Amino acid sequence: MAKERIYELAKELKMPSKDLVNLAKKEGMDVKTHMSSVTSDEANKLRSMAKGAGKPAAVKPAPKVQEHQSAPAKKEASRPANQGSQNNQNRNNRGNRNNNGNNNRHNSNNGSANANGNGGNQKRNQKRNQNNNNQGGQAANRNNNNGQGQGAHWFKKGKKNNKKKNRNKGNQRLRDTAPKAPTQRKDRPLPDVLEYTNGMNAQDLGKILHRSPAEIIKKLFMLGVMVNQNQSLDADTIEILAADYGIGAKEKVQVDVADLDHFFDERINNDANLADRPPVVTVMGHVDHGKTTLLDKIRHSHVTEGEAGGITQAIGAYQVKYNDKLITFLDTPGHAAFTEMRARGANITDITVLVVAADDGVMPQTIEAINHAKAAGTPIIVVVNKIDKPGANPDHVTEQLTEYGLIPEDWGGDTIYVKVSAKFGKNIDELLDMILLQAEVMELKANPGQNAAGAVVEARLDQGKGSVATLLVQQGTLHVGDPIVVGDTFGRVRTMTNENGRRIKDATPSTPVEITGLNGVPEAGDHFVVFDDEKTARAAGEERAKRAEDEKRRRTSHVTLDNLFDTMKKGEMKSLPIIIKADVQGSVEALAQSLQKIQVDGVRVDIIHKAVGAISESDVTLAEASNAIIIGFNVRPTPLAKSEAETNNIDIRLHRVIYNAIEEVEDAMKGMLEPVYEEEVLGQVEVRQLYKASKIGTIAGGMVVSGKITRDAKVRLIRDGVVIYEGELGSLKRFKDDAKEVKMGFECGLTIKNFNDVKENDVIEAYHMKEVPVK
């Protein structure tokens, strides 16, 4: 008996093989997969059951998608009812599509049987048709009009249908790319005041006003100003725009990034979040009055907690702790550092302690210290030292100091006096009490929560560490890693140590620290400022260094006897300022009178200062300011004066014989006159043979008959005793090699620049112009 496979039977019945397998299993047939076989009787039974199951599906209502289509629905009703389902059914069939088309035509009258098998496909069809209907009724109508069977759809109208599908896709793209309704964007509120800088453009203003550049441009257009987003606007236009928005306008002051003083003042004058800070004390006084002993006693007696046993001072400033309060002492080597810092605007001292020996009284340096402290505007605490020595007279010291306005409180004044013995440590605590009392009266405060600012106490170049600077923090807190600008240098704080050489991570106001990480060595008294980012710090530091270099170039170089003639030649001076220092007054007067007797036309000697004694720093400072020369007779400069003179290129001339000093100055002044030149013949060459070269010209070969001829000499061509031409040598050779000079008795070849009319037996004479000294 012939058997039929399930998949062939399902293909015949146009139903899924899976459904047919399930139907066969319900009837108890031995069927497992679509490849299973059934007998002819079983196949006929399945055919009848499949046809009977398809009848109810024929009376099902039409899909919902066709309810909305009036005209197309009538056309569809006249067509076989099973064609729509056949199209979807054929889409699931894996056989030949031509066969499917034939099957459609062959089974067109079996709609009732096929409808039941295609129920699931009809549901999917309904959903698909509903989607097409939502995309547009016209597109759905076109799709429904093509329901002529799957095979006919693909073979007869496949090309046309593809065009329609593409058209549908195009319509979908147009619908997707169509401009959507703009969403309502909430603009950020306008600022109360528009802070602007002259030259801003629409884009910059848009960022500040939280508006688009297009809106700004439109606003300006309505106000009668036509601009683009990158065009600069003047202040008037920006203010008009702000008024149109109903807000105020304020021009922002442009701050020069290299103006370190501006940033320094901004931080120093910040009154927000103020807190108490330790006082900064400078101890000054005459030599040998016990200043160093007093400082050492204070340091050894009141070391900061945690530093006991480690008293080695690493920097020129330190802190001591007394009664749970800190005091910062600046250990300046002398008044010079104090003066230098004050001259640079770094008034870092809060209180000046003036040390005066009870057995010595007021001395010249004591008076100088008083003047410095008064000029700096700092209160003075007088310490009368060495009260333990025999012959000490503190009252006499007080009487002397009253002449300079330092009247003690006991006498009705406001100056604090403390009598101490630094050697034995007597009344040291009383001195510290007075310092803290004075600081309390002064109400010293700072803001530790901001970027640090302060001044340089000292700086040096260390072979191992590089640039090392001792800083005193005046405002804010200095941290390791902070980008910093110090004077004309910049960098990042790499390390930070306290006065005992111990590394710390931060330094609060009035704390002295030693830092590394700068790109150069700053000067004492320079301000330092910490910036928010390294980029700004670098820009400020580089700009300051550039300006300092330019200023140095513009500054007139100091005159010396060596460059005196060149200086006068440029017309920069017509007088010679001189400072005279000698060992005795008689020598001073004799030297001054002798110099003023020198008579040279157009030049005069200007004695701006004359005195007895060694050449001091003040003399060097005066010479620097006056562009003068210092002449010393039987005196020497002090080490500091010598160092400062070398730094500032000040000319110091030292003599032991008055005549030598006068002669040296006279020679320099004569050099300032217009020089006289005369011709000096170097040698002669006799031309003996000529050579022609197309690229070079005429080459004269000859013998040096007298003197010598040099490459840089001027030459004249003499023919029969008459000068034919004067010019310069073009080349000079000995054999084939270039020569700088050829001496008498040697042959050479030479050319003359821009001249070729050389003949045999001509004489070429070499010469140069020599300056004749003024007599």
From Swiss-Prot:
Q: Where is the composition biased (Low complexity)?
A: 50-64, 81-116, 128-153
Which CDD domains does the annotation name? IF2_eIF5B, IF2_mtIF2_II, mtIF2_IVc
Q: Which GO terms describe its molecular function?
A: GTP binding; GTPase activity; translation initiation factor activity
Which superkingdom is the protein from?
A: Bacteria
Region annotation G4: where it falls in the sequence: 385-388
Pfam families in alphabetical order: EF-G_D2, GTP_EFTU, IF-2, IF2_N
* Its job: One of the essential components for the initiation of protein synthesis. Protects formylmethionyl-tRNA from spontaneous hydrolysis and promotes its binding to the 30S ribosomal subunits. Also involved in the hydrolysis of GTP during the formation of the 70S ribosomal complex.
- Quote the protein name from its UniProt record: Translation initiation factor IF-2
Originating species: Limosilactobacillus fermentum (strain NBRC 3956 / LMG 18251) (Lactobacillus fermentum)
